[in-house]
């Protein structure tokens, strides 16, 4: 399989998407963060010294999606039309699941934007609570689904 990010001399390059059609692109990614009961309670009770953790993580996830092309070298800058977040609590596991959906009308997909949003959002939770629990675990950052483009639809089973 030939990698699209390498030229004929195996040097890295940004893929030329100028001949692609503009289509609707949407991708959803998710990830988990597990923590101690104390850290979970601080977040749930909104008593973290650094401020509202989940609200800040949502803003960070949106910013992370928007800034993807600045931190991942071969990603194209995209005009995003939507970044939507959802946080699900797992009380028994002392965990939160962050879900990020990104949409645009463009020539390339938004999978990396969704994955970046999840990563930055979860890292923000870690940053804001690390004084309480340095053993938090960020896991299972995955692409859940994507639509649009020549590769078609993908849904994680």
Curated annotation (Swiss-Prot):
Chain positions recorded as substrate binding sites: 74-76, 112-113
Cysteine disulfide partners in this protein: none
EC number: 4.6.1.17
Involved pathway(s): Cofactor biosynthesis; molybdopterin biosynthesis
Catalytic activity annotation: (8S)-3',8-cyclo-7,8-dihydroguanosine 5'-triphosphate = cyclic pyranopterin phosphate + diphosphate
Catalytic residues of the enzyme: 127
Keywords: Lyase, Molybdenum cofactor biosynthesis
Gene Ontology BP, a term: Mo-molybdopterin cofactor biosynthetic process
Domain of life assignment: Bacteria
Gene Ontology molecular function: any one: GTP 3',8'-cyclase activity
Quaternary data: Homohexamer; trimer of dimers.
HAMAP family: MoaC_B
Free-text function comment from the UniProt entry: Catalyzes the conversion of (8S)-3',8-cyclo-7,8-dihydroguanosine 5'-triphosphate to cyclic pyranopterin monophosphate (cPMP).
Recorded family membership: Belongs to the MoaC family.
Annotated protein name in UniProt: Cyclic pyranopterin monophosphate synthase
